[in-house]
């Protein structure tokens, strides 16, 4: 008898995922490193993130259906994403995970996937880094 693989989206559930994202963006809105690259009204950003994370975690392809292929790197190129900002983004997410009670192996694996994604989005050095030419 084979066991059905666990789908991360089913493990976290829509309600908890959406709560995570709402808490996350409440933190982003107050973060001095992140605030400059986000709009003042984060409702549309949060809506798209909910769609993306649903799909990212193996749920329905609701992001792609509305917006096409995620093309994360290309969609983030207009914004100056530094290592410092990537870390601030991850800290906001970690704090949001704490607040919704996300823990254990699921949290560890999910967070590590987000670390890889956040680092992939970096497109500029920190302001205090020397740029070699």
What are the language-model segments listed below?
Residues 1-133:
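Core of compact, soluble alpha-helical bundle domains
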């Amino acid at each position: 008898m084979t066991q059905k693989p666990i789908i991360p989206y089913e493990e976290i559930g829509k309600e908890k995922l959406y709560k995570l994202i709402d808490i996350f963006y409440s933190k982003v809105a107050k973060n001095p490193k992140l605030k400059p690259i986000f709009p003042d009204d984060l409702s549309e950003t949060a809506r798209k993130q909910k769609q993306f994370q649903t799909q990212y975690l193996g749920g329905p392809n609701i992001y792609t259906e509305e917006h096409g292929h995620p093309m994360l790197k290309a969609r983030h190129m207009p914004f100056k994403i530094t290592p410092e900002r990537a870390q601030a983004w991850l800290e906001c997410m970690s704090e949001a995970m704490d607040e919704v009670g996300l823990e254990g192996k699921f949290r560890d694996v999910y967070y590590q996937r987000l670390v890889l994604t956040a680092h992939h989005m970096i497109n500029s050095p920190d302001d205090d880094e020397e740029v070699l030419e």
